[in-house]
């Protein structure tokens, strides 16, 4: 049996949740990656998050991650799609995705249930938009209504970069996202659009934080 430590009634963004947090997790094997020409490996940085979803989930991620993907793009236009398919043999995903964007990059990340069993997703997405880069990221949560979904998103924007996020959050019993952008380059722009659909006892929460450290920068948030 897989040993677990149980955290009962701890709070994330003032949402009270009860989770069985696994100490060891088998590799998540049901992943589809469609990639034009980007360099993809698993050498993520593992740097501490500025905000994230709290110490418990962050430590769980760094200690037990069962999927790590680092994407490094060229100066050309590139399209990448990553789909995580939850099934009866892949119920828990503790993942990190790191995107280092240099050109014009589109990334679609999808979490989808192919089972009625309860699934757990605890993810970190970290994006670095280098000078003059354009990065579009779309995140789609299609987990079943028994599942828990937690995503921590952190971005760094360099000079003249533009980062656009679209978050489509439909699935999960509890779904929590923390979004943070560190805008350090002049003329950098960040745009965030989110779509949330919840029924019955579904709980949705997203927290947005942006730090604009130089002049001529902008962030637009549309929820």
What role is predicted for each listed range?
Residues 1-68:
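Long, low-complexity, mixed-charge
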Residues 51-223:
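Conserved beta-strand/loop scaffold segments within soluble protein domains that form the structured core
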């Amino acid at each position: 049996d897989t040993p677990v430590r149980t955290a009962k009634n701890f709070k994330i963004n003032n949402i009270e949740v009860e989770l069985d947090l696994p100490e060891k997790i088998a590799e998540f094997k049901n992943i589809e990656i469609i990639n034009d020409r980007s360099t993809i490996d698993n050498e993520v940085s593992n740097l501490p998050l500025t905000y994230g979803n709290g110490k418990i989930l962050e430590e769980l991620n760094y200690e037990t991650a069962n999927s790590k993907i680092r994407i490094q793009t060229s100066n050309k236009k590139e399209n990448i799609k990553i789909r995580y398919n939850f099934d009866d043999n892949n119920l828990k995903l503790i993942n990190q995705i790191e995107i280092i964007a240099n050109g014009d990059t589109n990334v679609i990340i999808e979490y989808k249930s192919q089972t009625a069993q309860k699934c757990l997703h605890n993810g970190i997405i970290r994006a670095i938009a280098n000078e003059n880069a354009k990065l579009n990221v779309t995140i789609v949560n299609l987990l079943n209504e028994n599942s828990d979904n937690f995503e921590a998103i952190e971005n760094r924007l360099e000079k003249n970069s533009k980062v656009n996020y679209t978050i489509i959050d439909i699935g999960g019993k509890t779904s929590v996202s923390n979004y943070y952008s560190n805008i350090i380059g002049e003329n950098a722009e960040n745009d965030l659009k989110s779509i949330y659909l919840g029924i019955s006892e579904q709980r949705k929460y997203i927290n947005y934080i942006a730090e604009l450290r130089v002049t001529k920068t902008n962030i637009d948030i549309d929820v």
